[in-house]
Every structure is written in C-alpha cells, then in structure tokens.
C-alpha cells in the first residue's frame, strides 16, 4: 500500500503543474508541446499565437465593418484582416495596396459599360465618360459619385479658351487632383488613384475614358439632355447644343427651353452635320454614286433617274443634317423652322454654335471628329447663312 501511495505522487504533481499552465492560458495540446520541449522560444511563440486569436463573432464583426468601409469583395477583406492580425485600420491600408495589383490585372479587360456625367453652369458644360464592365457596377453609388465628381472637376478646370475642347484621361490627371467626400471614397487624390481604388472595390476594370467641355458666347446658352438617367446629371446618352442670340437683350430663358428640346432631338436622331453646306463634297458624291447605282436598276429614263437620285439625296440630308431633320417633337416641321420661330419669339436672330452627341461605349475618334468638324467650319456656316 505504501508503494502504491508513493507511486501516485509523481502523477499528482504532474496534474498540478498542468492545472497551473492551464490557468496561464495554455490549451492541453499547448501544454503537451511545452512538456515535449525545453525550448523557451517555442513556448513563447505558441503563447503569442494563442493570445492573438480573435473570437469568431468578433471576426465576423470586423469583416462586416471593413466591407462597409471599402465595398471590397469578402474574400479580399478577410485575407487582409488575417494578414494584418485582425487590425482593421492596417487591413484597410493593405486592401488599398492590393487594389493597385488587382486593378492592373483587370486593366486589359473590356470596359464598355458605364455612365456619362455632366456638370454645367450658365456658359459651360463638361461631360465625362467613366467605364466599367457591367451595368450592375454602373448602378453602384460609389461609381456614380466618382463619375459626377470627375465632371465637376473638369468644369472647374482652367478655361481652355476653345468653344469645344475634347480631352482624354491625361488632361485631368496632369492638371488637377480630385477632392472626394464619400463614406467609401474620400480625401484628395489623383484621378488615376481614385479610379484604381474604385476598381478594387467593385472587382472590375474601371476606366476614365474621355470627356469634353463645351462653351458659348456672352449672348448664348449651353443646353443639355441626358437619357436613361439613374439620377440627375448621369446617363448613358448625352446631347448638347449651344444657341446664340445676336441681340444681347434677348431673353435667354426662351433659348434654354428650346435648346433643351433640340438637345433631346440630337440624342434621338444622331445628326452628323450642322447644315448641308458642311457636308463634305466627297460624302455627297459618294452618296450620289450609291443612289445612282440603285436608280439604274429601275430601268427608267435618264431624266427620271436623275430626279430619283436628287429626291433620295434630299432624304439623305434630312437624315444626317441637323437643320434639315424633322423635329422629333413635331415632325411637321424641321429644326431650321424651329430656330426661325424662336428668333421671332425673342426678337433676335438665333443660331446654333456647336452641338455634340455622346454615348457610353462608342468609339472615341468618331465623337471627336464630329465635334471638330462642326467647330472648325462654324464661321463658314454662319457666312453661308
């Protein structure tokens, strides 16, 4: 019996030591690891690892908070929190660093969706195009906020001194920083950094693609129309036009009313030229050749075919020339007649300065060429009137 009691003493001592270690925060497995090695550094590492663990409920709360702050994908949010030992501020910085890498990987993907945004004052209007990959992201409030902010930034830029000034991403990137004030996107930063951060949030390729600024004279107005608007100042299609009155006393509110209606007309009808005089000779001759070939198949006389060609050519002008187009609001008249009626109403001759139509995802060069054609020959058109 004495032998049996003495044999129990080492076991009792061992259990007592285990209880002591358990009280210090070790699990049983950690205690075994401690007993199996005399290495002090190893036990210290285990202690740090176990003391830094965050309860599951707190982990979910941190993931939720960081997700609300950044809108980043949940898997990226969790990865940053884990790598930063569940420090939410450090994880937020880590997410921004990851965003640069992710945005670079996505930059080659096609971004043909998105929104146009417009900012406007009495004499100038700025339109920008911000692209993404899906219309789902285009409905995101952060995406819409950044698009509007870029339009306001373009409008606040130094007056380029041109009535129509098309620009690419470098114009805003080189000249100005954007000051953002959104819960998920804030602070003063470059345009490229803001776009990159947004791309990381939404998980898509996001690009600021292009824009233009349109101005008018002292006796004119800039009128605009946005189609399919998720909110004011945003849309997928934009029409702009400047109307100018010869008399400085002409009421500009009447010009605004009619101008907005014509801007809507421009979105609907897609005019390519301002007047017949501005249609290039090569374009007219090319269309005439096509119509003549079509007429020859009719088997009619030469005189009849010429009349047919001229009639169809007038129809062509009605399709592509703004002043000759049937007014979408009232197809019994055309835009030229609408402007004549407006001139009588305000007691002063009213003319079109410039116009533009822009659509999300369309070719940049086509828009720029259209605007430059109208602008470059504006004086010639006025003289021909």
UniProtKB/Swiss-Prot annotation:
GO BP annotations listed: mitochondrial translational elongation
InterPro entries tied to this protein: EF-Ts_dimer_sf, Transl_elong_EFTs/EF1B, Transl_elong_EFTs/EF1B_dimer, Transl_elong_Ts_CS, UBA-like_sf
UniProt xrefs under HAMAP family: EF_Ts
Designated gene of the protein: EFTS
Family note: Belongs to the EF-Ts family.
Claim: Methyltransferase is one of the keywords in the record: no
Reported function: Associates with the EF-Tu.GDP complex and induces the exchange of GDP to GTP. It remains bound to the aminoacyl-tRNA.EF-Tu.GTP complex up to the GTP hydrolysis stage on the ribosome.
SUPFAM superfamilies linked to this entry: Elongation factor Ts (EF-Ts), dimerisation domain, UBA-like
Subcellular location: Mitochondrion
The protein, known as: Elongation factor Ts, mitochondrial
Swiss-Prot/TrEMBL keywords: Elongation factor, Mitochondrion, Protein biosynthesis, Transit peptide
Domain of life of the native organism: Eukaryota
Transit peptide boundaries: 1-50
PANTHER family in UniProt: ELONGATION FACTOR TS (PTHR11741), ELONGATION FACTOR TS, MITOCHONDRIAL (PTHR11741:SF0)
UniProt keyword annotation of Mitochondrion present: yes
One example GO MF annotation: translation elongation factor activity
Major location (coarse): mitochondrion
Source organism of this protein record: Oryza sativa subsp. indica
NCBIfam families attached to this UniProt entry: tsf
GO cellular component: mitochondrion
Lineage: Eukaryota, Viridiplantae, Streptophyta, Embryophyta, Tracheophyta
């Amino acid at each position: 019996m004495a032998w049996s009691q003495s044999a129990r003493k080492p076991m009792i001592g061992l259990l007592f030591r285990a209880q002591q270690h358990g009280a210090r925060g070790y699990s049983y497995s950690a205690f075994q690891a401690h007993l199996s090695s005399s290495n002090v550094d190893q036990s210290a590492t285990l202690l740090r690892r176990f003391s830094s663990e965050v309860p599951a409920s707190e982990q979910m709360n941190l993931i939720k908070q960081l997700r609300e702050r950044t809108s980043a994908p949940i898997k990226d949010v969790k990865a940053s929190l884990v790598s930063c030992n569940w420090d939410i501020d450090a994880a937020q910085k880590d997410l921004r660093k990851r965003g640069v890498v992710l945005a670079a990987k996505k930059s080659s993907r096609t971004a043909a969706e998105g929104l146009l945004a417009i900012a406007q004052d009495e004499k100038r209007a700025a339109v920008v195009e911000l692209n993404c990959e899906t219309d789902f992201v285009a409905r995101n409030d952060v995406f819409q906020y950044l698009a509007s902010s870029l339009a306001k930034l373009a409008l606040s830029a130094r007056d380029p001194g041109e009535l129509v000034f098309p620009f690419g991403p470098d114009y805003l990137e080189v000249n100005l920083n954007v000051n953002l004030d959104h819960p998920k996107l804030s602070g003063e930063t470059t345009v490229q950094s803001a776009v990159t951060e947004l791309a990381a949030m939404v998980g898509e390729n996001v690009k600021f693609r292009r824009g233009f600024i349109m101005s008018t004279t002292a006796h004119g107005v800039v009128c605009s129309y946005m189609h399919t608007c998720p909110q004011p100042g945003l849309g997928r299609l934009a029409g702009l036009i400047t109307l100018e009155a010869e008399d400085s006393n002409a009421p500009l509110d009447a010009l605004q009313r009619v101008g907005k209606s014509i801007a809507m007309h421009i979105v609907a009808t897609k005019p390519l030229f301002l007047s017949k005089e501005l249609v290039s000779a090569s374009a007219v001759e090319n269309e005439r050749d096509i119509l003549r070939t079509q007429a020859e198949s009719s088997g009619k006389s030469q005189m009849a075919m010429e009349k047919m060609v001229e009639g169809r050519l007038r129809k062509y002008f009605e399709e592509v020339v703004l002043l000759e187009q049937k007014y979408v609001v009232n197809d019994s008249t055309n835009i030229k007649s609408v402007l004549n009626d407006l001139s009588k109403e305000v007691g002063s001759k009213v003319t079109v300065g410039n116009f533009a139509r822009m659509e999300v995802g369309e070719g940049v060069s086509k828009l720029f060429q259209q605007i430059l054609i109208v602008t470059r020959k504006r004086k010639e058109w006025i003289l021909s009137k």
